[in-house]
Amino acid sequence: MHGLFVNKKKNDTGSTALVLKKIQSGDTKLKEEFIKDNVPYIIRTISNILGIVVDDRNSEEFSIGLAAFNEAIDRYDADKNGNFYTYSFVVIKSRLYDFIRRNRKHNNVLPFSYIEESTRVDERLLMSDASGQFEKIEVRQELVSFEKSLKEFGISLEDLVLSSPKHKDSRLLLIKIARIIADDDNMFRKLVEKKYIPMKEVLSRIKVNHKTIQRNRKFIIAVSLILRSNLYDLKEYVQGFEREGKYHG
């Protein structure tokens, strides 16, 4: 049965839910096969969340991701949790963030991979025992506002985890571009009103290939919004990278 569970389409929630129901009923062999077939998905998810290449199946990161995937299987409820792979992504993300907080090795994980408030909210939503709990979860108003602003640009918090730059120099360059936009009232107004980066104005202020801006549009927009927001924790995180760049520059 190897390969049976690989490359499941997002709309294939029903068949996956049936498999998971059998597993939760005690079919341990099926569970082993399901986990084995999803190892590439687990590795890819860990790599995307941490912004690193995870190819060593004996690594601590992989062990945490594997345990989290197993946890997602055990706790999944098709009636409340929707698509299993979306659910498992959040569980893996939450467990990895717990690891990050304990391990200085990952101090340079990108800021959008470390939105703790969002992680807690996601996990509480997905793991709540009753749908009525959804309405009881309190979310910081500034984060809600930030998420709404991102949605206007077609960007989600998960998009930022996947699209954030992995290298320090790239990150500093993109933050510099975002700072140029945020500090210029005219450019920022165009960004907010027209929902695109004012390319001509940006290129007149900094020497950079326009393709670099296009490829990293989501990150630049998000940082620009943060710099003009009241998101003090995230703003401080961004400003910390700016200070570090100036110190080492």
Swiss-Prot record:
Cited Gene3D superfamilies: 1.10.1740.10
Induction (free text): Autoregulated. Up-regulated in the presence of xylan. Up-regulated in pretreated yellow poplar (PYP)-grown cells.
Gene Ontology MF terms: DNA binding; sigma factor activity
DNA-binding region location: 199-218
Stretches that traverse the bilayer: none
Activity regulation, per record: Negatively regulated by the anti-sigma-I factor RsgI3. Binding of the polysaccharide substrate to RsgI3 may lead to the release and activation of SigI3.
InterPro entries, per database record: RNA_pol_sigma-I, RNA_pol_sigma70_r2, RNA_pol_sigma_r2
Any one GO BP annotation for this protein: DNA-templated transcription initiation
Keywords: Cytoplasm, DNA-binding, Sigma factor, Transcription, Transcription regulation
Known partners and oligomeric status: Interacts with RsgI3.
The protein, known as: RNA polymerase sigma factor SigI3
